[in-house]
Curated annotation (Swiss-Prot):
Tissue-by-tissue expression: Widely expressed with the highest expression in testis.
Superkingdom assignment: Eukaryota
Subcellular location: Dynein axonemal particle
Gene for this chain: DNAAF10
One GO BP annotation of this record: apoptotic process
Protein name (Swiss-Prot/TrEMBL): Dynein axonemal assembly factor 10
């Protein structure tokens, strides 16, 4: 691929903020996005922005008691577009951004900070009931049904006497029919655990040696295909989730991507083989996954095992001197993306030529 054919990552708009931004998410079916974080005075903030004539217009600012760590629209309908958030106090809230004074749903979900959140069953993505998953420093991963108050529908926690590990990232997947659904969770010690929500059982676990910063399936609403896990020390792993070997688990390929922590991974909504990784030195890398000729083979005992593919770097750019802490592709406009970094700047990016790859 020549330099002219390569995708380019262009910083379209950048805006400095007066608070630390932990997460940013596009509002579905709009040119708007929300940013979440905390003011220096210790309170939480949600801001709603719209792109207008190449600039950002602040539509709404909502201040809350506790700093807000993460958010998702994944469990809401396209009509309501409610935002679910996790905060430093362990609270899960669902907000109507049109009337944000009181949450439409509120539960003290965890004893400590909610580090990560994901949603499924909303926005027409994923079969089955809408659900939210939260992962916390208290070591637990909980699944919530927004229609059911107070109690989680599933609670994955260490058995008594086992060390509680800090859960840093959670992701839904495999929601291709009404029954099937999995949650994948990554922890500070490098553990990755795959929970089967239909059978309420641990389906698979592995350890990638370094703390797991971000996990994402290439698609939530199909039979599990690929899972990307990013970690401290600049590495990420791509697991082929189609074939599970009874002892070897899933085949994987790893790549040393950045010279520092890989904070985030996000797959392009319009092409599941492309994904962006965001690094601790302020860099973004755009990758393409190539499948092997055969995705499975038989081992010496005749049991099917997966075969990993390869990843190639399409483009990289350094946007900041600080870590890029959050990243979100627009579900509606191919190549449009928003990211936030710890230099208190939010950037709207355009990635070109993605339809040519």
């Amino acid at each position: 691929m020549s330099a002219f054919e390569k995708p380019q990552i262009i910083a379209h708009i950048q805006k400095g903020f007066n608070y630390t931004v932990f997460d940013c998410k596009w509002v579905p079916c709009s040119a708007k996005f929300v940013t979440m974080g905390n003011f220096a005075r210790g309170t939480g903030v949600i801001q709603l922005y719209e792109i207008q004539h190449g600039d950002l217009k602040l539509l709404r600012e909502i201040e809350k008691a506790k700093p807000i760590k993460c958010g998702t629209f994944g469990a809401t309908s396209l009509q309501q577009r409610y935002l679910a958030t996790g905060d430093f106090g362990g609270n899960l809230h669902i907000w109507n951004l049109e009337a944000p004074e009181m949450p439409v749903y509120s539960v003290k979900g965890h004893k400590e900070i909610i580090n990560a959140i994901d949603g499924i069953g909303g926005l027409g993505i994923g079969e089955g009931a809408p659900e939210i998953v939260t992962g916390s420093r208290d070591g637990t991963v909980k699944v919530w049904d927004p229609r059911q108050k107070d109690d989680p529908v599933a609670n994955m926690e260490p058995v008594q006497g086992e060390n509680k590990r800090d859960c840093w990232t959670v992701a839904f997947g495999n929601a291709y029919n009404q029954e099937e659904r999995v949650v994948c969770a990554g922890y500070d010690n490098g553990d990755i655990k795959l929970f089967d929500l239909r059978n309420m059982a641990l389906r698979w676990e592995t350890n990638i040696k370094n703390g797991v910063c971000s996990l994402e399936f290439d698609r939530k609403d199909i039979s599990m295909n690929k899972l990307v896990a990013t970690s401290l020390e600049g590495k990420f792993h791509v697991f082929d989730m189609r074939t599970q070997h009874p002892t070897k688990g899933f085949a994987s390929v790893s790549e040393k991507a950045h010279k520092s922590t890989v904070w985030q991974v996000r797959h392009l909504p319009q092409n599941r083989e492309l994904f962006l990784t965001a690094g601790g030195a302020g860099g973004l890398h755009l990758w393409k996954y190539e499948y092997p000729i055969q995705r499975s083979k038989k081992d010496s005992e005749g049991i099917e095992m997966g075969v990993a593919g390869s990843v190639s770097l399409l483009q990289n750019v350094t946007l900041s001197t600080q870590p890029i802490s959050s990243l979100d592709w627009s579900p509606d406009k191919r190549g449009l993306c928003v990211c936030s970094s710890f230099d208190q700047t939010v950037r709207v990016l355009i990635v070109t030529k993605l339809n040519k790859i």
